[in-house]
Every structure is written in C-alpha cells, then in structure tokens.
Regions:
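A short, internal acetyl-CoA/4′-phosphopantetheine-binding micro-motif in the GNAT/acyltransferase core
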Residues: 72, 91-106, 131-132
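Conserved beta-strand-loop-alpha-helix junction that forms the acyl-donor binding cleft
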Residues: 128-139
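A short, well-structured alpha-helix characteristic of acyl/acetyltransferase catalytic modules
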Residues: 1-57
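Conserved acetyl-CoA-binding loop-helix of GNAT-fold acetyltransferases
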Residues: 103-117, 139-144
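Conserved acetyl-CoA-binding loop of GNAT-fold acetyltransferases
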Residues: 143-153
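A short helix-loop-beta-strand connector motif used in the catalytic cores of GNAT acetyltransferases and
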Residues: 58-71
Length: 163
C-alpha cells in the first residue's frame, strides 16, 4: 500500500549490485529467513520460528503501515532476494536473511538510502521503535548512521535521527 499519499517506487537502486524491490505479495522465498532462532532473537526477542500465517500477517501489516522492500543483490546477472526492510517515519526494521550477506555493509547502504528517502519525503526525523539491548549489531548500524537513543523501552531503546 505504501505511505499515505506517497507513491512507493518499484525499485530503489542502492548501488550497481544492490537494489530494493517493492513488496509484491510474494514472499515464499523469505520463509526460511524467519526460521533461524538466533536471527529471531535479535529481531523479535523470541526464538519461535514463524509460521506461514505469521509471516503473512507481518508482511500484510507492514505493507499497510508503510513501505516494504526486498533487498536484492545482483549475482550472475540475476537479482537474488537476501533480506527485507520496512520503512515508515517511526520505524525501519531490516533483516539480512541470507547469512552469507551479513557483515558486508549491505544493511548500512540500505538504511543510508532510506534516510535519503525520508529527507526527500520532507521528514524532519526518523525513529526506530526498539532495538533490543542484546542486539549490538543493530545498535551499531543505526548509531553509526547518526541515530541516537532517546527513550528506554521494555527490552532496549528507541532511536531517533534528526534530518
């Protein structure tokens, strides 16, 4: 659905080998990303693997609340989905679901591009609803891009970036 009154682009180019592709309702390939208990602990604070119904509920909710994209990398002249990111002014969760692509700077490039999108949309600030206290990689990702903790949450902190 995208952000009210704003047309969501089909693609957002991150660089020559990475792009965001607008959510199209097809996500069967993403199911395996939401089965890894360590990943889920960082993402949800729970180790319970997703069911297809829960995955559908998550993507449906995010698609109604904001913009949803699949993160794709160009490999042998074909784009491959390796994760997802959702974007709205008050939250921006990202998952590099394919572990082979973690720790390669992809999440940093994606969040940096979505910060630019926020500026283009006229936002004065962006927020991250909650990063768990044990999710040090996400804390580092967002703070390195200028986000600052501003509010304590049940299991961590909310972060804000003034644009």
């Amino acid at each position: 659905m995208s952000i009210k009154g704003i047309e969501q682009p089909e693609y957002i180019e991150i660089d020559k080998k990475i792009r965001l592709r607008k959510f199209d309702g097809k996500y069967d390939f993403a199911f395996e990303w939401y089965q890894d208990t360590d990943t889920l602990w960082m993402l949800d604070g729970d180790k319970e693997p997703y069911t297809l119904e829960l995955l559908d509920k998550m993507y449906t909710w995010w698609n109604q609340a904001g913009e949803v994209y699949f993160i794709e990398v160009l490999e042998d002249e074909i784009y491959k989905s390796i994760g997802d990111v959702s974007f709205k002014q008050d939250d921006m969760p990202i998952l590099i679901g394919d572990k082979n692509y973690r720790k390669k700077g992809i999440a940093t490039k994606v969040v940096r591009k979505l910060i630019e999108r926020g500026k283009e949309l006229g936002y004065k600030e962006l927020e991250i609803e909650e990063i768990y206290s044990w999710n040090l990689d996400s804390q580092k990702l967002y703070t390195n891009l200028g986000f600052k903790p501003f509010k304590e949450t049940k299991n961590g902190m909310s972060y804000k970036l003034i644009l």
